[in-house]
Amino acid sequence: MSKKSKNSSIEFDAIVVGGGHAGIEAVYALLKKKLKVVLITLDKKKLASMPCNPAIGGPAKGIITREIDALGGVQGKLSDLAMIQIKYLNESKGPAVLAIRAQIDKEKYSKLILKDLKKQENLLIIEDLVSELLVEKNRVFGLKTAKKQVFFSKTVIITTGTYMDSKVLRGSLAIPSGPDGQQTSNLLSNNLKTLGFELQRLKTGTPPRIFTSSIDFSKVEKEVLPVYNINFSFQSKHKLKKQISCYLTYTTAKTHDIINKNLGKSSMYSGLISGVGPRYCPSIEDKIVRFSEKPRHQIFFEPETKKQDIMYINGLSTSMPEDVQLEMVKTIPGLENAKIAKFGYAIEYDALNPLELKKSLETKRVKGLFMAGQINGTSGYEEAAAQGLVAGINAGQFVLGKKPVEILRNDGYIGVLIDDLVTKGTKEPYRMLTSRAEYRLILRNDNADIRMAKYALKSGLISKKEYLKIKAKYAKIDRKILELSKEFVSPKDELAKKYNLEKRISKLKLISWPNVNFKDILPDFEFGYELTVMARLKGYIQKQNSEAQKMIRLEKLLIPGELNYEKVANLSSEALDKFQKVRPKTIGEASRISGVNPADIQMLLFHIKVLKMQKVSKI
């Protein structure tokens, strides 16, 4: 097909398909590069909607949001403006797993985005469905929509979330629909299959929502929180002045009886669902079956907006019929007279096999075509936003003829996320966990800014001035560490008496003790917390940095792109199959592919060495 037609008045630099959390980050990344962008979405009033829980952050996820902010993304800033509650998680478990979680006013979040995007000069927002990608010689050059519109562009980013050929499932009902009753379509799914892409069916779910006025709060536990002086964004000056509470209750024996009695009516257990659900966010039916020995399960009431008129019932995700949901809900303390605002449901949808992707999130099959978010088999707003940002950055790099930006595993959870997807793939919705990161002592909540700074600068998402400001912050911390190593506390000092010191020690050693409040030593130093973490974890950080350097060396060992793996002697059949499918670029990537063992890597290294020797001998 010709790249020019009567419908083509403008060739855009990029088209972003889908206005969810991934799509929004992609759009902003492209706009920061001063590129012309089209955003195609179903409903511009539901940009970055939250069809599941109204929250951002949590273990590992909160660190991802900090990384997004440090990389030049918007999720952290928007969350700070729309939050109605914010807190630390895992405070007692140490700084390596410390994370922020915030309850978000979901309506305000979407409104803030739309208001800001309307101001952007190089952006066109279209409400439509995509029906076909325009591809010629394995390169995308635009797309067609359901409304017969044609757009031409140098690159396309698909961020369709859970909307591709999706079905909402409740009991025996399977309704073609996207989340929150939005439109679905199989047009793009069919088009991707025609182009040769491997798709898979995945499933997720959501709980019922309850009118707050129908809840008996005398029977539930109120979460009382202090006002934390914290934010997701490193630049944000907005502070939450008042915390809005969430509430805790539990399922009962009656709840479990109703679920067990009606298990066959659940879409999940009736055989209606073929997609694989998220392992770490099971439905209430799954919990009752898999953990039958537990007498009760936690249920949290989370307000969806500042108005607090509707509560999200966290922990009660279900695909039961409406009558069973109502019966089930009324057995939970506090919900005896509950009125359901929206029933829970499961949703099944098409997703891409992420082994189809490069680390840049460009597809291997079609040049200039990028994928990000839940279409890549992930779950969660944070994972989606991170991918959208990386896809937006690299689509911009593609347009500008620059090298892609690829974040290493030792530099960020974003790097871990993408590396896992493109080397291991996933057969279930992938959720980021701290346990997935082998360098988590380095990938902390407090140092996301310095970890992402070089990538943000390379991407053009922060200025040289902003970059130097971050570098200056850590130079200041290093100078203060040196000062503290030369300053001592003697047993006669007031500080020594407070901490029962019997001998003279340096302030640096004292601040590294876990029971010492760093403010006693650094009352006026603005980066006291960061310094204290670095001092306390120094030995562990050095060890992980050393391990990371070994990984980096493997990343520098390139595998020839044209390598014929069938000629590599003594490879296991599984390694041969995986290498041919994934086509890793480096030995480091190859070593992380599931099913590949150290012997396979040795054989691969030996084969590459022989090839190099043969090339030299021919010269």
Curated annotation (Swiss-Prot):
Chief location of this protein within or outside the cell:
cytoplasm
Give the record's GO CC terms.
cytosol
What's a Pfam family in this record?
Answer: SAM_GIDA_C
- List the keywords (alphabetical): Cytoplasm, FAD, Flavoprotein, NAD, tRNA processing
Tell me if Cytoplasm is a UniProt keyword of this record: yes
Q: What does this protein do?
A: NAD-binding protein involved in the addition of a carboxymethylaminomethyl (cmnm) group at the wobble position (U34) of certain tRNAs, forming tRNA-cmnm(5)s(2)U34.
Which protein are we looking at?
tRNA uridine 5-carboxymethylaminomethyl modification enzyme MnmG
Q: What is the lineage of its organism?
A: Bacteria, Bacillati, Mycoplasmatota, Mycoplasmoidales, Metamycoplasmataceae
